[in-house]
Amino acid sequence: LHEPYRRQRQMCIRDRQCPVHKDREPGCIPACSITDGFGGAGAYSDGKFNITSEFGGWLTDYLSNDEVEDVIHYVDNLYLKHGATKEITDPTTDKVKEIEHRGYAVGLKLLRAKVRHLGTEENLRIMTEMSNELKQHMDLQFKTAVQDIIVEDHHATGIVLENGQTIHAKKVVLAPGRDGSAWLTKVLSNQGLKLYNNQVDIGVRVETSNIVMEEINKNLYEGKFVYNTSVGTKVRTFCSNPSGHVVIENHSGTMLANGHAYHDPKLGSKNTNFALLVSHTFSEPFNEPNEFAHEISKLANKLSNGSVIVQRYGDIKRGRRTTYKRLKEGYTDPTLPEAVPGDLGLVLPYNTMKSIIEMIEALDNVTPGIANEHTLLYGVEAKFYSARPKVRDGFESEIDDLYVAGDGAGLTRGLAQAGANGILVARHI
């Protein structure tokens, strides 16, 4: 809401409790603490701030690359103001070019970016500082569900809360985050606005030894590669976490694999984890890609009794399930002990699994050892694409004085562009 006022059904930053902290009660009510609350999905991420317009969102559909990167640098300076690390990777070194060359030789494209790794614990501290600063200039209210928006003469004039209370404002900004995308779709559809999305990413979280990933970790921190498979799909690496931990996220009752890494080396593991995601694009008449991913993920939940499945790559190639005995005999110690050994072949569609295998074999030419039989795959990991409404200058919707922003509006996919999107909306208002 413009008037500086903010309503949110989830929790404030200090009340968010990640299930990773085993001595605490997981904060899953009213929503998952990893993805919901102040700071959104970014607050409990491992805090990779990618300074690039090449990935992390679609702001370049509306602005030039230079304009987007200028705002990203502005957001980056805000993070630095609140104590973010000054360390940043250099994607232009000779060593990076050598890695890129090896990738091209086998059909892998490297996406370069300067990366400022904040770390999960530092990211939370920075978000807390930002929250405290905002409280000095605006009213924040949490655990308050917004039911609808008020529209009069094609102008947004306020919101309706779940308890029936109405709040009026000159401008309304909807930025509900990834887990609020379904809510945003419902609210805007009820107003007659059309939203567009027919894609979802489905894959696994890969975990291997830091030794295997040492060259990538040292020179890139996160190696973002894209690969076109023999079955016509596109696979990408995503969210690499050196010395990281695999975790479980609760997406509205669907348990998904994910990963994070701390900035403090003392909190790290001996493993690196990253996602391998296969893009799934559908044609008519099907128009529920996110539900498709939920159903696949729920099958893994059912087979693992409410958790996620872990399988050794060697067992996948042999067409057999991983057992507790085989997992224990492996050289990679899983950082997510709650994951249940099983068979991802019973869960993932054929083309999805084939795409993942082809990608791992290609990556083995860039980082030798990743295709060894002890590499672990956790499933399912999915990235839901939020439906995107049509927007005008300043990300104003087709309803006057109603603005949308961030991952929940299908405009961004990461810390940098999400922050930039918010700044652009604020400047326009």
Place the predicted regions along the sequence by residue.
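Single conserved hydrophobic/aromatic residue that forms the stacking wall/gate
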Residues: L1-R9, I13
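FAD cofactor-binding and catalytic pocket of flavoenzymes
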Residues: F225-Y331
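Glycine-rich loop(s) and the adjacent beta-strand/alpha-helix scaffold that form part
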Residues: K171-L220
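Conserved N-terminal/central alpha/beta ligand/cofactor-binding core
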Residues: D15-M138, W183, N190
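A conserved FAD-binding loop/helix module that cradles the flavin
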Residues: W183-K186, G408-I429
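A conserved short coil-to-beta-strand element within the FAD-binding core of flavoproteins
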Residues: F142-H155
